[in-house]
Amino acid sequence: MSQELEELRMAWLGLKARVDQLAAERQQYLEFFENAGAAYVVTASDGRIVEANGAAVDVLQRRKRYLRGKPLTVLIALEQRAEFRSRLACIATGEATDRTWRTVLAAGAERVEVEITARIIGEPSSGICWRLEAVQ
């Protein structure tokens, strides 16, 4: 019985060490994501914003708490939304081959032309990482 308890204790310590390692890796990823020079927005496959980094907050001219849970579509200029929705549907199902295009954001009171690049995270249903780069 004591041998089994010792094995359980060792397994528990191994699992705890792995959890601590994963937490440290996640924190490192979050810091990298937040401080990346490029603007990144992560959405669910339906386009709802899950996360946005500091550069994206600057480009979109919105606070993070406003962005989280909002459809990315509402930040696209009205006349560009139909095209964005169509591309989002193709990207979300894995059908799109061209995942980079230009669109216009309605950023606060300004309109900003951006090159937008979408990358599927894992499986198409897992989510989409969007890179937004202002066009000069």
Model-predicted segments: where are they?
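PAS-family sensory domains
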Residues: 50, 99, 106-114
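PAS/PAS-like sensory domain cap-loop motif
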Residues: 56-67, 78-79
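Sensory modules in modular signal-transduction proteins
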Residues: 20-59
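Short loop/turn elements at sensory-signaling interfaces that couple input to output
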Residues: 116-135
